[in-house]
Amino acid sequence: MSSLDKTMYFDFDNDSVKDVHDTLTTVYEALQEKGYNPINQIVGYLLSGDPAYIPRLKDARNLIRKHQRDEIIEELVKSYLKADKDVDA
């Protein structure tokens, strides 16, 4: 079996969960304060990786860049599934 046929495994430190939550909260507040639609801007950043979607206000741009985008997406998916169903994520 070639390495391309194997499933990749991601595992993040549990301490990063709170950090990601705190970062997203700060970013959300900064975007609201600037008058942007926070959800659209965060999605734009996550899809493109372009930090221009995130303002410098409250150091939001630097904070969000401390996390890998896949780490943020993983925490968002876990949070969604826990809220939607009683899933052990």
UniProtKB/Swiss-Prot annotation:
Pfam family, one: IreB
Record InterPro entries: IreB
Family to which the UniProt record says this protein belongs: Belongs to the UPF0297 family.
Protein name, per record: UPF0297 protein lp_2275
Species name: Lactiplantibacillus plantarum (strain ATCC BAA-793 / NCIMB 8826 / WCFS1)
